Amino acid sequence: MGQKVNPNGFRYGITKAHNSVWYADKMQFASHLLEDQKIYDFFDKKVRQLQIGNVQIKRNQNGLILIYVYTAKPAVMLGTNGENIKNLTKDLQKILKNKKANISIQVIELKKPDLNARLLAEDIAIKLENRGSFRLAQKFAIKAALKAGAKGIKTSVSGRLNGVDMARTEGYNEGEMKLHTLRQDVDYAATTAKTTYGILGVKVWVSLGEILSDEQKAKQEEMDLLNAPKDRRVRRGGERHASTKKN
């Protein structure tokens, strides 16, 4: 059987940037790593409430923890006069067990949330929990992603679908999805839907096209110009027609 690697981890350091960016010595590395995991787990629980698509963590030498939160609803994330940010900062300090932790949360708006695999997967999971059709939920997500400009999308739902005794997996695939091509910008997310029949697994792959360097872009533009159809010029007197011979 083929072993399927996580598309995000497969591309980190090549076409995708790491979510955690900092440097630490051997004495601090383990503690920083544990803190990052606690921060990610904290925001994972608030994905549906705040429509969080991605979280990135950066640290500087002064001990400042910069947390970039990409959300589809920045107004809900900020709250009135930034009250939600203050509350989130206090909650993080409690989780990290450090009331003096210097934490700065930066909210960034997702311009196209329908291209974010995490938000699409959560949307499918919410519909499944509300007893919606797993087929329609996937089709709506595919339609929304393609309309937003995705080159391709793949979805998968596994578990006791419709409450049957035998668990199975059903999914849809539309457009291009080159998982083996590292130049292909693929966003992947997996989540779970808690239904009365049990837990269903939801996976979403979104392809945003290939990431090309400047040289590759120039070559691609040249090829597009060469392959472009030439304008058909009509000669004077109109187009030529097949002449009929007179008997």
Swiss-Prot record:
Subunit structure, interactors included: Part of the 30S ribosomal subunit. Forms a tight complex with proteins S10 and S14.
Residue stretches of biased makeup (Basic and acidic residues): 236-247
GO-annotated cellular components: cytosolic small ribosomal subunit
SMART domains recorded: KH
Span list, region Disordered: 221-247
Keywords: Ribonucleoprotein, Ribosomal protein, RNA-binding, rRNA-binding
GO BP annotations, alphabetical order: translation
Domain (KH type-2): residue spans on this chain: 39-111
Keyword Nucleotide-binding appears in the UniProt entry: no
Cited function: Binds the lower part of the 30S subunit head. Binds mRNA in the 70S ribosome, positioning it for translation.
Protein name as catalogued: Small ribosomal subunit protein uS3
CDD domains given in the database record: KH-II_30S_S3
Source organism (scientific name): Metamycoplasma arthritidis (strain 158L3-1)
Family, per entry: Belongs to the universal ribosomal protein uS3 family.
GO MF annotations in UniProt: mRNA binding; rRNA binding; structural constituent of ribosome
